[in-house]
């Protein structure tokens, strides 16, 4: 009986030791899991922790990434868009001004007189007709000379999609020592300009010398007209008014 009691007591101690070891092991595993997820899990709201499970998408760091992305997208959508629109408008405006400046640099202008006033005329080999804008007609006081377009049903081939609103049958232009009496189509344009078309340039036997910056007129008695500095036609002709 004595030995039996000793064996029973020894068995109990061994059982207690095993249970204690098992509890310690469970606590260590629990602490390890908590340590692994501490930095990310503590930052998550409780509803994000309820269903972590074993899925990769449901792990704390993935949930955090999704929340951050959702927050950033929400800020972008609700943030002010005016600065971006303003920046885009400025870029488009700068691009437009750059293209316009490039076109103006390619223009050939010569000094002439029309209706007793100095005008800088554009030498336009890309258009068959002489053109004068409504603004230029107004400045030169030629409104009473404007007549309705003869070929109203006929669409003239004009650059820049200009609209013909009338014509002047006898537009007197003094170019150098030459006095020209030529027709011109009146176009609806805000630019105060006058342009000499290909028909007039051919009739004057004109040669454009880009090396000397001269417009040479005539075949036998040649006359050279120097190019003038290229500036905005609107600003230049306004200053002459």
Swiss-Prot record:
SUPFAM superfamilies: Acid proteases. GO terms for molecular function: aspartic-type endopeptidase activity. It holds the Pfam family Asp_protease. GO terms for biological process: proteolysis. InterPro entries: NRIP_C (IPR033821), Peptidase_aspartic_DDI1-type (IPR019103), Peptidase_aspartic_dom_sf (IPR021109). CDD domains: NRIP_C. Transmembrane segments: none annotated. This is Nuclear receptor-interacting protein 3. It comes from Homo sapiens.
């Amino acid at each position: 009986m004595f030995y039996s009691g000793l064996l029973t007591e020894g068995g109990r101690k061994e059982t207690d030791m095993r249970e204690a070891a098992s509890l310690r092991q469970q606590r260590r595993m629990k602490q390890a899991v908590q340590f692994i997820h501490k930095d990310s899990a503590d930052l998550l709201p409780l509803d994000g922790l309820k269903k972590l499970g074993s899925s990769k998408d449901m792990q704390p760091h993935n949930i955090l990434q999704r929340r951050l992305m959702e927050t950033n997208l929400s800020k972008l959508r609700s943030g002010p868009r005016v600065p971006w629109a303003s920046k885009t408008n400025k870029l488009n405006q700068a691009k437009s001004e750059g293209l316009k400046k490039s076109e103006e640099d390619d223009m050939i202008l010569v000094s002439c007189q029309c209706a007793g006033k100095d005008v800088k005329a554009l030498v336009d080999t890309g258009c068959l007709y002489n053109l004068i804008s409504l603004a230029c007609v107004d400045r030169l006081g030629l409104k009473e000379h404007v007549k309705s377009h003869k070929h109203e049903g006929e669409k003239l081939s004009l650059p820049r999609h200009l609209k013909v609103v009338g014509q002047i049958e006898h537009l007197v232009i003094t170019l150098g020592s030459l006095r020209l009496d030529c027709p011109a189509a009146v176009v609806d344009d805000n630019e105060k300009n006058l342009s000499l078309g290909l028909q007039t340039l051919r009739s004057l036997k004109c040669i454009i010398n880009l090396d000397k910056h001269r417009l040479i007129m005539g075949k036998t008695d040649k006359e050279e007209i120097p190019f003038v500095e290229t500036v905005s036609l609107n600003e230049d002709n306004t200053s002459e008014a």
